[in-house]
Amino acid sequence: MEYTIFILLLPLLSFLVLGIGGKWMTHRTAGIIGTTVLAVVAVLSYATAWQYFSAPRLADGTFATLMPYNVTWLPFTSTLSIDLGILLDPISVMMLIVISTVSLMVHVYSFGYMKGERGFQRYYAFLSLFTMSMLGLVVATNIFQMYLFWELVGVSSYLLIGFYYTKPSAVAASKKAFIVTRFADLGFLIGILIYGYYGGTFGFTPDTVSLISGGASMLPLALGLMFVGGAGKSAMFPLHIWLPDAMEGPTPVSALIHAATMVVAGVLSLIHISEPTRQ
């Protein structure tokens, strides 16, 4: 599954190409580039899922957790470090399919829906950034890497909701979404730091559970703060106030944020975070 790295690199490349060189492109060219890249990403995601679920299961009948890529970015101690990589498990593989498929449909639909709109190239650049951020979030190998992509999701959603920046209501809606989710993300970050300090790891795979025993008394606080972050991203009460106003963005963006990807990011993070505590 060495090609899985391209699932992240291709939309990132699309964002850079459209963001930097989009003003010299026609609307048609920008749309074709963005849509074609997402089509390739979707094919790679389906290929990854096919290969993953076709592989032999473990002795207990479960699917293996794989890390095709994992490099240490910032080492702190022998056990505590910030790694960057790709983690594949049944949840992340299925989410790759969901995100790539829905995002591809949004790209295709937007080609006609946004025709003639000012900033067409910028729109497709932001879509590529949002998609890359969501894909990176679901395949993160640890909680801190998840947080990095988590913030990229917030930034890209702010840019998409406020796409019509000459419209005061759209600007207000984007600011509201950004501020509310940043408030929740602050709790998420504090929870991650407590989790890493007392647990001795940022990992959320089951084999790291033994490292948490020394900080068991602080674990509920860390998980509670991380839950606040998930609640904000998933628009749970009382941090739901930003979601209705997100309709100020282009309609395809609203579909992408409301129904498909961003609002499930919080739930997905809570599933991953709960894994080290199942003992």
Write out the residue ranges for each language-model feature:
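...captures the hydrophobic TM-helix bundle architecture rather than a specific catalytic motif
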Residues: M1-S274
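Short "domain-exit" segments at the C-terminal end of structured domains
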Residues: E275-Q279
